[in-house]
């Protein structure tokens, strides 16, 4: 049997309710198993992102609560620190509380990962998704 550690976490009520619906829908035996599965998925994504190398082009999509203190200013300042990677940005109002920014990037994969990590860690950021491709003629036929 695998050693297990018991942990405690705090979640917003609506987030847990939505997660519980998915647990039931997918037929998990327990909430713990669903959380373990979610953590495994997160670890796989993290390893994939951090294994990228070389020149890449892609997008960083960010959803954030624009009422969160200084979040827009912090995101803008971070983007200015990586201006050599950023080709363009698109800003969209999703609803009264949330905005989405799509940042088009091209450059070294390591620097793109670094930029993504900095954007992700900001308070008020709800979700970040990095999508990258190999630019130019390096696409398999």
Curated annotation (Swiss-Prot):
Give me the residues that bind Ni(2+), please.
80, 91, 93, 99
Keywords (alphabetical) are: DNA-binding, Metal-binding, Nickel, Transcription, Transcription regulation
Q: Which GO terms describe its biological process?
A: response to nickel cation
Organism superkingdom: Archaea
Q: Name one GO molecular function term.
A: nickel cation binding
In terms of SUPFAM superfamilies, this protein maps to:
ACT-like (SSF55021), Ribbon-helix-helix (SSF47598)
Entry's cofactor comment: Binds 1 nickel ion per subunit.
Per the entry, which co-factors are needed? Ni(2+)
Query: Which ranges form a coiled coil?
Result: none
Any Pfam family: RHH_1
List, alphabetically, the InterPro entries matched. Acetolactate_synth/TF_NikR_C, ACT-like_dom_sf, Arc_rbn_hlx_hlx, CopG, CopG/NikR_regulator, Ni_resp_reg_NikR, Ribbon_hlx_hlx, TF_NikR_Ni-bd_C
> What PANTHER family does its record include?
NICKEL-RESPONSIVE REGULATOR
The UniProt entry's sequence similarity note says: Belongs to the transcriptional regulatory CopG/NikR family.
Relate the protein's function as given in its record.
Transcriptional regulator.
Q: Please identify the protein, giving its name as recorded.
A: Putative nickel-responsive regulator
What organism does the record attribute this protein to? Methanococcus maripaludis (strain DSM 14266 / JCM 13030 / NBRC 101832 / S2 / LL)
Task: Specify the taxonomic lineage.
Answer: Archaea, Methanobacteriati, Methanobacteriota, Methanomada group, Methanococci
């Amino acid at each position: 049997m695998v050693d297990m550690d018991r942990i405690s976490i705090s979640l917003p009520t609506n987030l847990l309710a939505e997660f519980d619906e998915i647990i039931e829908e997918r037929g998990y035996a327990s909430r713990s198993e669903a959380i373990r599965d979610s953590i495994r998925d997160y670890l796989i994504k993290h390893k994939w992102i951090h294994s990228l190398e070389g020149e890449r082009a892609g997008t960083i999509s960010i959803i954030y609560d624009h009422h969160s203190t200084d979040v827009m200013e912090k995101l803008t300042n971070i983007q200015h620190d990586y201006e050599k990677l950023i080709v363009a940005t698109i800003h969209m109002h999703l609803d009264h509380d949330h905005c989405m920014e799509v940042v088009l990037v091209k450059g070294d994969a390591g620097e793109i990962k670094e930029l993504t990590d900095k954007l992700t860690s900001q308070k008020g950021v709800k979700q970040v998704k990095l999508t990258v491709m190999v630019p130019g003629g390096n696409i398999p036929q």
